[in-house]
A protein has these predicted regions:
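Active-site gating loops and adjacent loop-to-helix segments of metal-dependent hydrolytic enzymes
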Residues: 1-11, 55-81
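Hydrophobic faces of well-ordered beta-strands that scaffold small-molecule active sites
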Residues: 1, 40-44, 106-108
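Alpha-helix N-cap and loop-to-helix initiation/capping positions
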Residues: 14-21, 25, 62, 83-87, ...
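Extended, H/D-rich, highly charged conserved domains that either
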Residues: 32, 47, 52-54, 100
């Protein structure tokens, strides 16, 4: 995920475009990994950072603000740490959506299978 963010930050996109690129790139990466026979499951630490109370939807302004803050920290300190609840919840929602769309035998999703099915309302257009 950090690689995706670094690639996007190199493009110096406006916040909305960067958020759309992040969402699309993360979903694509997870989908590709789900089909890889060498990948046995997915695990993320995002819930350890902001908790298991994952919001079903986040407002675009909050997501964009979190991404801008993350970008500033990356430019100033050269490090990326996803500790913004709105972004972390988005990551979990993307993974949940992927898990619900693709019944992939043998793949496990830690924390994800216990979450209720949600709509695609989180996708940023």
């Amino acid at each position: 995920m950090k690689g995706i963010l670094k690639d996007i930050f190199q493009l110096n996109l406006p916040a909305k475009a960067a958020l759309n690129a992040f969402t699309a790139s993360l979903a694509k990466s997870l989908k590709e990994s789900a089909g890889d026979s060498n990948v046995v499951g997915f695990k993320s630490i995002v819930c350890y950072r902001t908790g298991l109370n994952v919001a079903i939807v986040s407002c675009t302004a909050s997501l964009e603000s979190s991404l801008v803050d993350l970008f500033k920290t990356y430019k100033e300190e050269g490090r990326l740490r996803l500790a913004h609840k709105a972004l972390n919840d988005l990551v979990v929602r993307i993974a949940v959506e992927l898990a619900s769309e693709h019944d992939i035998p043998g793949k496990s999703y830690q924390f994800i299978l216990k979450l209720p099915q949600i709509s695609k309302c989180f996708i940023i257009e």
